[in-house]
Amino acid sequence: MPKINILNQQGDLVSEKVLATTVFDIKPNQQVLYDVVNAQRAAMRQGTHATKTRALVAGGGKKPWRQKGTGRARHGSIRSPLWRGGGVTFGPSPRNYSVKVNQKVRILALKSALSLQVQNNQLVVLDNINLATHKTKDFQQMLQKLNITSKSLIVVTQMTEQLALASRNLSYITLETASHASVYQILNCKQLVLTADAVNYFEEVLK
């Protein structure tokens, strides 16, 4: 069973915790990770792209000239895709890109992502995060004491206003609650920072 050091905000060792093998020490399923990350990234797409077909472009109801006798090519509408200002053929239309993923697959992907971070020694566990102020400077000093200087995901169980304000101006920090942390977010960081409560939450929900 994997053990992890629990640190305080000053970077000092407070205690050790034995992580649940069924959550933090499974063999990562690469195919499941691939499928779930693709589904989560697809769900982020707005899908609001749109073009107008010849039926949607204004005008063009009248035949521009008679069928025969002019010497010119026959046309029925000035909004044909052949014309400048005409409709678009087979252009994109608004659609929903989301893909359904079964709950068991999502759970397995989350376990795989957490286990992968543990195996890569990219997991940091804090006993708690309590900020006296909402200043980014104070929060950044705490991160420096913990040697967190690269792209990181910080997962807490309760989002406080002070923590949200202090972290929002740091481009390399993503703050998320344990109930909303996604597989894509966990994999897309150099360091995963969990509070002890967040670890307990994952072990309880994913057991």
From Swiss-Prot:
Pfam families: Ribosomal_L4
Biological classification of the source: Bacteria, Bacillati, Mycoplasmatota, Mollicutes, Acholeplasmatales
Bias kind Basic residues: ranges: 63-77
GO-annotated cellular components: ribonucleoprotein complex; ribosome
UniProt keyword annotations, A-Z: Ribonucleoprotein, Ribosomal protein, RNA-binding, rRNA-binding
Known role: One of the primary rRNA binding proteins, this protein initially binds near the 5'-end of the 23S rRNA. It is important during the early stages of 50S assembly. It makes multiple contacts with different domains of the 23S rRNA in the assembled 50S subunit and ribosome. Forms part of the polypeptide exit tunnel.
Family according to the record: Belongs to the universal ribosomal protein uL4 family.
Protein name as annotated: Large ribosomal subunit protein uL4
Subunit structure: Part of the 50S ribosomal subunit.
GO biological process annotation, one example: translation
SUPFAM superfamilies documented for this protein: Ribosomal protein L4 (SSF52166)
Residue numbers spanned by region Disordered: 58-78
Gene Ontology MF terms in the entry: rRNA binding; structural constituent of ribosome
Family annotation (InterPro entries): Ribosomal_uL4 (IPR002136), Ribosomal_uL4-like (IPR013005), Ribosomal_uL4_dom_sf (IPR023574)
